[in-house]
């Protein structure tokens, strides 16, 4: 009887250990990633089957703005997000005392200038009005486009990652940059034709049916440091599921798919086999 009791006890203990281990495994193999609708969620949907083969059940939660994804990540509502670039993440952490980190850089979305009135930045008239989103971390990108076109110069020592419109030294056409709009509204403002030119992030341009490489009158170069990334809470970048997610997103096959689908509007960053 004692022997039978011992066997039963051992069996129950082994089963408990198995169930406990299985629960931990399941917790790490199902991840929820918050993302912008395009191209981020589209890219994630593309890699879902591959991740399934890797034992990862990927759930995607789509956000339509740049505010909620980091709040949801910080609150533990999602495991990671995919919508922002490095300067935006740094700025958010600074303003919100956050500890979110970059788990891997995936792609670049060149920011572009669009106009229904003019074919190039150099054709903009004196006293032109340009609409820009209120994302402070993108101001340097906008300024560089206008600087490269010879329309403005910047004060000595200006760093693009922290630049604002107050850093403009000379503005030979007296261009007014109105930067009070939510990023997601920029395509509608472009369609309204209110301004002489409108600056739009490529994800919102693509969502609106625009083709950045064809429709933009000025487009950020591939060498831009503003790579879109997978963000996680500090420490989670070491989770096996997150590592697998980043590896699949940076694989050559995924990046080939990105190049073919977006035709230069979205540019892969680096690659892994």
Can you say where each PLM-predicted feature lies in the sequence?
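Sec-dependent N-terminal signal peptides of Gram-positive bacterial secreted proteins and lipoproteins
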Residues: 1-26
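Short, well-ordered beta-strand elements
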Residues: 28-38, 56-62, 129-130
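Hydrophobic residues within well-ordered alpha-helices
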Residues: 33, 73-74, 189-191
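Beta->alpha turn/N-cap motifs
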Residues: 38, 65-66, 76, 80-90, ...
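Short helix-initiation/N-cap motifs at beta->coil->alpha
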Residues: 61-71, 158-188
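A conserved helix-loop-strand patch within extracytoplasmic ligand-binding domains
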Residues: 103-152, 255
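Periplasmic-binding protein-like
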Residues: 105-115, 140-147, 206-246, 249-273
């Amino acid at each position: 009887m004692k022997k039978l009791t011992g066997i039963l006890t051992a069996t129950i203990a082994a089963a408990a250990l198995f169930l406990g281990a299985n629960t931990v495994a399941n917790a790490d193999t199902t991840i929820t990633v918050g993302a912008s609708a395009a191209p981020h969620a589209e890219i994630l949907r593309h890699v879902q089957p591959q991740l399934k083969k890797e034992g990862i059940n990927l759930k995607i939660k789509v956000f339509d703005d740049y505010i909620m994804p980091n709040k949801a990540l910080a609150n533990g509502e999602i495991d990671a997000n995919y919508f922002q670039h490095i300067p935006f993440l740094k700025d958010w952490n600074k303003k919100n005392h956050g500890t979110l980190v970059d788990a891997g850089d995936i792609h670049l979305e060149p920011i572009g200038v669009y106009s229904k009135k003019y074919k190039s930045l150099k054709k903009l008239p004196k006293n032109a009005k340009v609409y820009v989103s209120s994302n402070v971390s993108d101001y340097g990108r906008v300024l560089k486009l206008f600087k490269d076109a010879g329309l403005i110069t910047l004060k000595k020592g200006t760093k693009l990652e922290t630049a604002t419109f107050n850093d403009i030294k000379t503005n030979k056409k007296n261009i007014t940059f109105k930067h009070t709009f939510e990023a997601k509204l920029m395509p509608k403002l472009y369609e309204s034709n209110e301004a002489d030119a409108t600056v739009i992030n490529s994800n919102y341009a693509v969502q609106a049916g625009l083709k950045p490489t064809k429709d933009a009158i000025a487009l950020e170069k591939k060498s831009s440091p503003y790579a879109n990334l997978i963000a996680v809470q500090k420490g989670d970048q070491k989770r096996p599921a997150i590592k697998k997610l980043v590896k699949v997103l940076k694989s050559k096959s995924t990046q080939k798919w990105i190049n073919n689908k977006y035709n230069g509007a979205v540019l892969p960053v680096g690659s892994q086999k």
